Amino acid sequence: MSGVLAQRGRREAESRLAGQSGRLAHVRGVVTAAQQFGRHFDAETADCLVAAAWLHDIGYAPSVRRTGFHPLDGAEFVRSAGFGELVASLVAFHTGARVEASERGLEGLSEFSDPPSDVLDALTFCDLTTGSDGAPVSADDRLSDVLARYGPEDPVHRAVDAGREELLAAVRRMRDWL
């Protein structure tokens, strides 16, 4: 499945993350996982999900980075690039971003509406079951990897600690769909 938004998302991700081969490998793995969910959504929503999979880490690109909080920076870019509100909100709120924004004292996510919970759960599932190298991984292993990369005082570490149960609940909800 490759709709117009997904194709545009791929071009943006491959261009803007070109110098970050590890991150791009992860993004490609997330896209592969997201394509599994296409049959559960209408064509437009499925296209938005795959586009968001391509774009969920675009906020790490130097050309996009503004605040240093990749979900917010990415969502602002996605909105300004005309990908639509669903894609922007998925990028904004993916994988526990609301908890991390709170840990960072950022309020910028309030500019975005909450995406449908099932679509957000699907993107979160895909992100949490794809390792940093793009290979499938258990959500527990992925979260352990994130915790190991960030010290206990880092907002990422604190957010994963605080949001772990909800993140794993999203993964469980989506496993039933597969």
Where are the model-predicted features located?
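Divalent metal-dependent phosphate-bond-processing catalytic cores, especially two-metal-ion Mg2+/Mn2+ enzymes
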Residues: M1-V4, S15-A43, L55, F83, ...
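Acidic-glycine-rich active-site phosphate/pyrophosphate-binding loop
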Residues: G3-Q7, C48
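Short glycine/proline-rich turn/loop motifs
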Residues: R10-E14
